[in-house]
Amino acid sequence: MPSLQLLQLTERGRGLVASRRKSILLAAGIVAAGGTAVYLKSRVASRRPDSSRLCNGQSDDDETLEKLTATDQNAKITTKKKKGGGLKSLQVLTAILLSQMGKMGARDLLALVATVVFRTALSNRLAKVQGFLFRAAFLRRAPLFLRLISENIMLCFMLSTLHSTSKYITGALSLRFRKILTKIIHSHYFENMVYYKISHVDGRITHPEQRIASDVPRFSSELSDLILDDLTAVTDGILYAWRLCSYASPKYIFWILAYVLGAGTAIRNFSPSFGKLMSKEQQLEGEYRQLHSRLRTHSESIAFYGGETREESHIQQKFKNLVSHMSHVLHDHWWFGMIQDFLLKYLGATVAVILIIEPFFSGHLRPDDSTLGRAEMLSNIRYHTSVIISLFQALGTLSISSRRLNRLSGYADRIHELMAVSRELSGDDKSSFQRNRSRNYLSEANYVEFSDVKVVTPTGNVLVEDLTLRVEQGSNLLITGPNGSGKSSLFRVLGGLWPLVSGHIVKPGVGSDLNKEIFYVPQRPYMAVGTLRDQLIYPLTSGQESELLTEIGMVELLKNVDLEYLLDRYQPEKEVNWGDELSLGEQQRLGMARLFYHKPKFAILDECTSAVTTDMEERFAAKVRAMGTSCITISHRPALVAFHDVVLSLDGEGGWSVHYKRDDSALLTDAEIDSVKSSDTDRQNDAMVVQRAFAAARKESATNSKAQSYQTQLIARSPVVDKSVVLPRFPQPQTSQRALPSRVAAMLNVLIPTIFDKQGAQLLAVACLVVSRTLISDRIASLNGTTVKYVLEQDKAAFVRLIGLSVLQSGASSIIAPSLRHLTQRLALGWRIRLTQHLLRNYLRNNAFYKVFHMSGNSIDADQRLTRDLEKLTADLSGLLTGMVKPSVDILWFTWRMKLLTGQRGVAILYTYMLLGLGFLRRVAPDFGDLAGEEQQLEGKFRFMHERLNTHAESIAFFGGGAREKAMVDKKFRALLDHSLMLLRKKWLYGILDDFVTKQLPNNVTWGLSLLYALEHKGDRALVSTQGELAHALRYLASVVSQSFMAFGDILELHKKFLELSGGINRIFELDEFLDASQSGVTSENQTSRLDSQDLLSFSEVDIITPAQKLMASKLSCEIVSGKSLLVTGPNGSGKTSVFRVLRDIWPTVCGRLTKPSLDIKELGSGNGMFFVPQRPYTCLGTLRDQIIYPLSKEEAEKRAAKLYTSGESSTEAGSILDSHLKTILENVRLVYLLERDVGGWDATTNWEDILSLGEQQRLGMARLFFHRPKFGVLDECTNATSVDVEEQLYRVARDMGVTFITSSQRPALIPFHSLELRLIDGEGNWELRSIEQTTE
C-alpha cells in the first residue's frame, strides 16, 4: 500500500483529492463553524433582551465608554450585573482593547497569528516525519532513519523557538492589555476627584485599588492566554480537518463535531457560575488586603492603643471568610473537573481511538499482507493518530472556552464596573457645570459667595440650611462651631468634593473644584512621596511651575515656617515618605509653606495649624494677611479672632449666624449671642458655648484685663550635651542575611505537617494518586501497543474488547486527575493558612507590625508579602511538589520498564542525558529568583501608591493633586511594565533552550532507542505474529521512553521553577526573620524598665534616641505621682511624641531606668494602669460601641462592666449596663447625637474615619480614655481639633475620674490642669522640668 504521506503523489491519491475538493472545503467550513459555535454558544445563551448595544471596537476608548453608559447612565452597575449578567462586560473590554491596541498591538497580534500558523504547519510536518521514523525503525533502515532524525531534530528546535516566541508574544500582549486598561481607568479615576468620590461619596465600589492592581493584570493575563489557546485550536482544526479529508472520509469530522458539541452541551448544563465565584473571591481578597494596608497606615496609633489583639481578630475573620469561599470554589472545580475530564479528555480519547483505528479495519487504509505494507500502515497510524488527536484537542479547547470565558467575566464585570462608574462620576462634574452655568449656578468672580446653599452629607444628613454669605477679596472669614457641625463639609461643597444640592455659589476660577485662585490647606496634612522641593510646590510638578523655585526661595519659604533645618537633614534630590519622617506639627508647617509659595487670592485654612504653638499660628495668620491673601479659616482657637473681620457660626443642626467685627467694640456681647437662635438641642447648646468662648476671648484681647494666671519654677534641667560622646546604640532588630538553603529549611519546618493531621493525609493521598496515575499511564502505553498489534493482525474482536477496557481506564483517569489537581490546590490553600498564621503570630505581637514599617532600615512591604506574595508562593510550591513527586515516581517505574526492554544501555543513555541537560540549563539560566522578587516588589509599590491615594483622598482632592498623584502612580506603573518586559525577554531566550532540552530533544533519543531495539529484535520477520510483537514493543517502548524523558524533562524544568520560587521565598522569609528578631529582642530591650509601680511613673537618666540615632532628650529624669499631672511642651519635632513612644515600649529604653504602671489593657477599668490616646486619631472597624471600648471586644467590655458596676447579672443585663455606661460617656464628650444619627444605634457599622470629623474622632479617643479609666492617661495632642471649651470639659471629666495626665499640647488653656511642665528645648537633647503654680490676682 502506498504511503499515506505520499498519497497525493500517486494516481490514486490525485484521483481521491480531485474527487473530494468540495468535501474538503465543506469539512473545513464545518470545523470552523462548529468551533465558532462552541466558542460563542455561552455568549448567545447569556444575552438578554434588554442588553444595551455593544461597541464595534473601532472607536476610541472615550466613545466606547460613552456608548456603554449612555443607555443607562444612572442605573447602578450592580443592578445591571444581576439583570444582564453574561459576558457583556467581557465583550465591552475586548472591544476597547481592540480599538486601543495601536500599531504595535496589532503587530503583536499578527505576529502571534503567524507564529501559531507556522507552529501548526511545523507540527504537521513533524507528525509526518515521525511516521516515517516509525516505518524506518520497523524496517531497520538505518541510513534513512539517520536522515529523518536529522530533519526531526531541526524541526524540534524550530518548534521550541516558536513555542517560546508564542509565550513571549502572549506575555507582551498581556502587558499591553494591562497598560491599556490601566491607562483608561487612570484617565477617569484621577479626573475631577473621582478617586475621592468613588469611595467617599458614591459608595458603589469598594477597594478600587484591588481592581486596578489585581483584577486588571489577572484579566489581561488570562485573556491573552485564551487568545493563544483558541488561535491554536482554530488553526489546528482547519489544517487537520483538511488533512483528514485529503485521505479519509469527511464523516470522521462530523463524528468528532457531534461528540464535542454533545459533550460540551452536557458540561455547560453542569457548570457552576465560575464568573460569580471568581468575582466574589477577588472581593474577599480585596477586603483582606485592605485590612493589612489599614494596619500599615495606622500602625503607630494601633501600637499606642495596644490594639494588636483586636486588629488580629478582624484580620483573622476576613482571612477565614476568604479561605471558606476558596474551599467552596475548589470543591466546585473538583466535581466539575471530573465530569469535564471524563467527557472531553478521557472518554474522548477512547472515541478518538475508535476513529483512528476504524479506517484501518474496514477502510481503504487497511494494510496488505506484505511486510512493506504493514510498515506503511504503522507510518499511517502514527500520522493519522496525530491528526485525530489534534482535532479532538482543538475542538475540545474551543468547547471549554466557555468555562474560561465565564471565569474571565468575573474579572471583566469588576473592571467594567470601575470604568463605568469612574466615567460617570468624572462626567458628572462636566455635565453639571455646563448644564448649570447657564442658570448662573457656578460662576467666576473675585469673591466667594454662598446664596441659599444647603450642605448635605452623602448619607443624607443636613448640616447647613440656606446659607447666604459673601466674602470679598481682602476680607477674612472665621468659621466656628462644634465638631461635626459642617465646617469642613461646607468646603467640600465649595471644592466640588460633594455635590451642591441647592443654592448658588460664586467663586474665582472655572469649574466646580478648587483651583489656583483658591488654595486649601487641609485638616489632615498630606505629604506626597518625593523630594523636599516637591512638597513645597505640590500639587505642581517641576514642568508646571510658572516661576521656578530656586534654592534661595526654598530657604526663605522654610525659614518662614521654622523648618530650614530640613535642608541639612535631607539631601535635595532624595525621595522621602515625608508622612513617616515628620511630626504632625512639622507637616502642618510644611503645608503653610506651600501656601506661601502659591500665593492664592483666597486661602482656606481648615484647622491646619492645630498642632503648632499659638504664637506660631498667629505669626502665620499675619504673614498670610500681609501677603494679600484673604483667609477663610476654620479654627477652635479664639486668638485668631483678631485676624478676621467676619465670623460664621454653625450649630450642627442646620442653623447658622454671621457676625461682623466692628473696630470700636468687641465682637459680640453675651446678649447678642443668646439672641442669635434659641437653643433647643444639645448640638445648638454646644454652638452657643463655642460662640461665648470666642466672644470672651475677644473681650480679653481687647481690654487685656487679665494677667497670666500661672508661673513656673525650674526644678531640673538636662546636663550639657557633649556631642563628641558616642550615643548608645538604638537596639533595632538585628537580622543576618541567611542563605537560601537555610530559608528553605525554615519554610519546610513550617509547612511539613505530621502524618496524623489533615494536611499530612492530603500529602499521603497525593502520593497515592501519583502512583495510581503512573500505573494507569503504563496501562495506557501498553494498550496503545496492543491496539497497534491487533490492527496489524486485523483482530477486530480483540480490539472491541480493548475498547471496553479503555472506557474503564477513562473512568479511573477522570477521577484521579481532577482529584490530584484538587488536592494540589488544597495543599496550596493549607500552606497559605499555615504560613499566614505563622507570620501573623509574630507580626501582631509586641508591636512587631510597627517595627516592620518604622524600624526595619530597608523597606519591607509586609502588607504585600502577607497577601499577594504569600498566595503566589504557596501556589507555586504546591505545583512544585507535584512537579517533583510525579516525575520521580514516573522515573522509578518507567526506568524499570525501560530496563526490561532495552537493558542497562538504554537506562545509561537516559541518565546521562538527564545529567548533561541539567548541567547545561544551570549554566545558561538567568537569576530568575532576584528578577521575580523585584517584580513582586514593584507590584507592591504600585499597589501601595493606590492604597495611599485612597487613604489620603480628601486631602489630595482639596489640593487638586489628582494630576500630581497620577504622575507618581504612572511612574511606578511604567517601572513595573519595563521590568516585566525585560523579564519576558529573558524568559524567551531561556525558554527556547529549556523547551528544546526538556521536551523536544528527548523525542529524538526515544527514536534512537527504538531503532536500537528493532535492530536487536529476534525472530522471523516474515511472520505476522513476530511483526505484531515488534510493532507492539516499538509502540510500547516509545511510550515508556517518552514517559521517562517527560519525567526527566519535568525534573530539569524544576530548576527554573525553583529559581523563580526563590524570589518569593526570600521575600517571605526576610519578613519572617525580621519578625523573629523583633520578638527575640523584646526582653533584652526592656531590661532597664520596671513595671512594678501603680502609683508612680518616673524617668531616671533615660536617653530618648530615635531609630536614626538622633538624641531628642539627654538623661531625662522626672517623676510623676498620682494626682500631679505633667505637661510636655516644646517646638514641633523636639521629641514630645518620642518620649511617649519610649513610655509605651514602642521604642526601647536605650539607657537609664523607667518605672511605670502596667500596660496590660485588661488591668484597666478600676483606676489602675496606663492608657494612651495618640496624636493621630484611629477609628477601628466595627460598631459605634466598638469605637469606645477599643481595643476590647464586646464580650470583654461586658465582663468588665459587669465586674465593676454589678454582680452576677446575666449577659443580657451586662450588655444593657455597658450600653448605659457608654451613653454617659458619649454625653461627657458631647457625641450622644451619634446614637440618633443612624438607625442602628450602638450597632451601627460604617466607615467612621470618613463619617466623623477630626474633632469628633478626637473626642471618641477621649471617650475611650473615660471608658478604660486608667490611673495615668497619656494624651499626645489628642484634643487640638476640638474647641477650647470642649477641651477643658474633657480634661475636667478625666480629672474628676482620678486620671493623672501626661499631656503633649501647644494650648495654654490646658496649663491649669497640670502641676509639672517638661519643656523640650530644641530637639537636640536639652530639656527643662518646671513646676506649675497657679496664681490669683
Curated annotation (Swiss-Prot):
Domain ABC transporter: 448-695, 1091-1337
GO terms of biological process kind: lipid catabolic process
GO molecular function: ABC-type fatty-acyl-CoA transporter activity; ATP binding; ATP hydrolysis activity
Consequence of gene loss (knockout): Impaired germination after imbibition, rescued by sucrose treatment. Resistance to FAc, IBA and 2,4-DB. Compromised ability to convert acetate into soluble carbohydrate. Defective in lipid mobilization and accumulate acyl CoAs. Poor initiation of lateral root formation and smaller rosettes with fewer leaves than in wild-type. Crinkled and waxy leaves.
EC numbers for this chain: 7.6.2.4
Keyword presence, Membrane: yes
Membrane spanning stretches: 24-44, 142-162, 247-267, 342-362, 900-920
Residues at which ATP binds: 481-488, 1130-1137
Subcellular location: Peroxisome membrane; Glyoxysome membrane
EC main group: translocase
SMART domains: AAA
Keyword terms, alphabetized: ATP-binding, Glyoxysome, Membrane, Nucleotide-binding, Peroxisome, Repeat, Translocase, Transmembrane, Transmembrane helix, Transport
Pfam families: ABC_membrane_2, ABC_tran
PANTHER family named among the record's database cross-references: ABC TRANSPORTER D FAMILY MEMBER 1, ATP-BINDING CASSETTE, SUB-FAMILY D MEMBER
Function per UniProt: Contributes to the transport of fatty acids and their derivatives (acyl CoAs) across the peroxisomal membrane. Provides acetate to the glyoxylate cycle in developing seedlings. Involved in pollen tube elongation, ovule fertilization, and seeds germination after imbibition (controls the switch between the opposing developmental programs of dormancy and germination), probably by promoting beta-oxidation of storage lipids during gluconeogenesis. Required for biosynthesis of jasmonic acid and conversion of indole butyric acid to indole acetic acid.
Protein name: ABC transporter D family member 1
Organism: Arabidopsis thaliana
